[in-house]
C-alpha cells in the first residue's frame, strides 16, 4: 500500500513538473518576452506585482520607459496580459504607417473593453465612426456650426445660473458636462431633443457608465470578466431608456424618407439623420440606432469636458491670460460676428486649448492599436498577433528635446509659433503630429476633433466675453487626478464667475 502511495505521489510530482516545464517553455519562447519590461519583473507571478505598480504609478512607469527606450517599444504589465508601449516620435510615426497590420478599430474596442459593454452587432460594423469621419469635417461641418454656435448661449443660460451682480460659485465639471452635451447634441439630434433634460441625463449616464466599466474591467483578470460580464448592463439599460425618447423623431424621419425620398428638401443635417441614412437600408433595430448615437455622444463629449475644465481653471487663475483671450475674442467677433470664421481666428484661445491638451492631456496614452497578425517592427521587435499597443503620450508631450520649456504651461506658445512661421494650420489644437497626439495621429486620428475644437472655443469665447472668472479659496488650481491611464479633473472643483457689466453685450444668441 505504501509503495502504491509512493507511486501515486511520484506520478503527481511528475505531472506537475511537466506542466511547469511546458509553461516555462511557452513563457520563454513567447515573442512578447523579448520586449523589455518596465515597472518591475516579467516573471510569472511577479508580473502581477508589476501590474499593481503600473495601476498605481502609471505616469511614472511610462516616463521611465520613455526615457530608457527612446524611439523603441517596451511593455508594461496588466493583470492578465501585456500592454506594449510605443515610445517616441519615430516609433509613433511607424505605428501610424502600419495601420493595415495594427488596427485602430480593434485597439479602441480593446481599450474600452467594448465586448463586455456594447452590443456585439454594433462592434462588427462601426459605420457610425465612418459617419463622424465623413460628416464632421469640411463643408458638412461648416453647415452645422451656425446652429451649434447658437446653442452655446442657450446651454449656458440653461445650466449656469448667476446671482445678480455678485460672484457665483460654479462646480465646473457637472456644469460643463451639461453645456457640452447640449451643444454637441444640437448637431447630433437637433434643437428639440438636445434641450431635453431627460435625454441629456441618459446620454451623460451612458458616457459615465462606459468609462466606469472600462476602468473596472481594465484591472480585472479575464476569468473574472467572463463571470461578471452578464451583469454589466448599465450602458445597454441606458440605451433602452433613450429609445422611447428618440423613437418619435426616428419614426417621423423614417416616414418622411419613405414618402419623399429624394424630394425631401428640408432633410435634417445632423448625426442622427446621417446614421439613419445607413441604418434604414440595413433594417437595423431602434435599439441599435440609439446605441450608436449614444456611443458617438460618449466619444465626442467625455474628453471635451475634461479639457474645457482645465482651460477654465487656467483662465480663472490668471487674469492677464483671461484678458488677452477676451480682447482677441471681442475683436474677432466685432469683425465677423459669432461665426466659425471668428472662432477660427481666435489664435490665443486655440493656443491655450492646444497647450492644455499637451501639458495636461486627457489620458497618459494614445493611439490604441491591436495587431491583426504577427508584426515585425523596423528595429526587429516582433509583435505577436493579438498584441495590444498604445503610445506614451504624457512623456512625449513633456519631452524637452521636442518642446521648449516642456514642463512649463505656456498658454500662448502656439499662437506665437503661428505668428513666427505663418503656418496656422500646423499649430491648431486639432492638428496632430508625431510630437502631439492627444487625438492620436494619422488617418485614424479622432475624426471628431475639428468639431470638438470649434465647440470648445465657442463655449470658452462666450464665457470669457460675458463673464468674469476667478478662483475661490486660496486662488490656486485644484490638483489633477491620475486614475490608471486617465487624467481627470478634481471632483467638486469650482470657479467663481459673475456677469460682466457694460461692454459685455456680445452673445452667441
From Swiss-Prot:
GO molecular function (one): monooxygenase activity
The positions annotated for binding heme are 446
Which EC numbers characterise this protein's activity in its record?
Answer: 1.-.-.-
Family matches, as InterPro entries:
Cyt_P450 (IPR001128), Cyt_P450_CS (IPR017972), Cyt_P450_E_grp-IV (IPR002403), Cyt_P450_sf (IPR036396)
Q: Which Pfam families match?
A: p450
Keywords in alphabetical order: Heme, Iron, Membrane, Metal-binding, Monooxygenase, Oxidoreductase, Transmembrane, Transmembrane helix
The entry's protein name is: Cytochrome P450 monooxygenase CYP512U6
Organism whose genome encodes this protein: Ganoderma lucidum
Gene name per UniProt:
CYP512U6
